[in-house]
Amino acid sequence: MLKIYNTLARAKQTFSPIIPGKVSMYVCGMTVYDYCHLGHARVMVVFDMVNRWLRSSGYEVTYVRNITDIDDKIIARANENGETINALTDRFIAAMNEDAARLGVWRPDLEPRATDYIHEMIAMIVALIEKHHAYAADNGDVYYAVSSFASYGKLSGKSLEDLRAGERVEVDAHKRDPMDFVLWKAAKPGEPSWDSPWGPGRPGWHIECSAMGARHLGPHFDIHGGGQDLQFPHHENEIAQSEGAHGCTFVNYWMHNGFIRVDDEKMSKSLGNFFTIREVLEKYDAEVVRFFILRAHYRSPLNYSSHHLDDAKQALTRLYNTLRGRELPQLDIDWRQPEAERFKQALDDDFNTPEAFAVLFELASEANRTGSAVQAALLKALAGQLGLLQRDPDEFLKGEAVAGLSPDEIERLIAERLAARKCKNFAEADRIRDALTAQGIILEDTPQGTSWRRS
């Protein structure tokens, strides 16, 4: 039975969908003004894993991940680049989809773009004003009145008094309360705007997700996910907006993945340790990055370093070596089989991927010890639940290096080494082996010939 850690309840809870057999899930996606970074990669991969496991468990899933395509940062970047907002956002949406595909992430069922839902956002703001949860200021902005929502702070576990005392909030004379947040921003010269009952303007960030979630999943749905950094204020504000407008529970299960740290420091541009997905994929195979992300529990902090990526590469190489050169039988997973049952128990326990990985490595050890093709096939099938180990082993082990020798060049050198050995020129053969080793190429001489892989 699946259990999920619910941020709202601060506990693991047995998952019980609103409609038996069906799951509605919304995940906050990217603001598309730049290339996706490692934090985005973690959100993509973690909730892809959740999506895969829910489907494997027999649920019919509707997975929505939004795209924020209007925002202060987007406007600033478009102006800085001298390009239109549409050109900027289209370019980075395409780049985001390329990055996600390389990481083995399945496309969500729906990817709504905020600018296509302005009508729904305006309608929700109108409802909030009618229900006295929001007010129009004299400057054309519309604000949510947080004091009107009695349970504001329930997701973050903070009272309004604590928030007022502890949060640094920009002073705005148009607000009735410093904690009130904007639902609609009055138009500024040179910025895109839409007509509304309060004059031309554009939506605030928080209302976008509330409106898109309700449009596609209804006012009450099963799972809402995102990075831990969104818990407050974004998700807190979503609850206030959605429950204020619709008068019912917004989401049953709130899931938040942990932060990315770089060499045990917070990842940030100011510290100079900020990496895009593309920068990381210049150095590491995309499956290694996916493996690295999933090896940690999704709620734990994830520490990025070259040491940890190298370790992930070695671990994944070990698993692929188990599959290499074997004729694997077609296998439908029997979840009553001991290793499969333990794997399922791990993922049913709040998606405990570290425990699931432990099962994979035990299977690899057993397959290597016994030579069992059935054990190796089960290893591949279970890893497939996580989007791993589905390539031809040689494709991974001999895969294109980010830099250095190509497979054709390696094969040529191996042939030269073989010729040198036949001529008993062992010094030349050793020189070629050493040169390949220096390039990270490991040779394995067998009676059937010489095979190779990247270290």
Curated annotation (Swiss-Prot):
Cofactor(s) the protein requires to work: Zn(2+)
Molecular function GO terms recorded: ATP binding; cysteine-tRNA ligase activity; zinc ion binding
Pfam families listed in its UniProt record: CysS_C (PF23493), DALR_2 (PF09190), tRNA-synt_1e (PF01406)
Highest taxon of the lineage: Bacteria
Motif ('KMSKS' region): 266-270
Catalyzed reactions per annotation: tRNA(Cys) + L-cysteine + ATP = L-cysteinyl-tRNA(Cys) + AMP + diphosphate
The record's free-text note on cofactor binding: Binds 1 zinc ion per subunit.
Gene Ontology biological process terms, A to Z: cysteinyl-tRNA aminoacylation
Annotated ATP binding sites: K269
InterPro entries in the record: Cys-tRNA-ligase, Cys-tRNA-synt_Ia_DALR, Cys-tRNA/MSH_ligase, CysS_C, Rossmann-like_a/b/a_fold, tRNA-synt_1_cat_dom, tRNAsynth_Ia_anticodon-bd
Keywords, alphabetical: Aminoacyl-tRNA synthetase, ATP-binding, Cytoplasm, Ligase, Metal-binding, Nucleotide-binding, Protein biosynthesis, Zinc
Coiled coil: none
UniProt motif ('HIGH' region) ranges: 30-40
SUPFAM superfamilies attached to this UniProt entry: Anticodon-binding domain of a subclass of class I aminoacyl-tRNA synthetases, Nucleotidylyl transferase
Enzyme class (EC, first level): ligase
GO cellular component, one term: cytosol
Annotated EC: 6.1.1.16
Subcellular location: Cytoplasm
List of residues binding Zn(2+): C28, C209, H234, E238
Quaternary state and interactors: Monomer.
Family from the record: Belongs to the class-I aminoacyl-tRNA synthetase family.
Listed name of the protein: Cysteine--tRNA ligase
Gene this protein is translated from: cysS
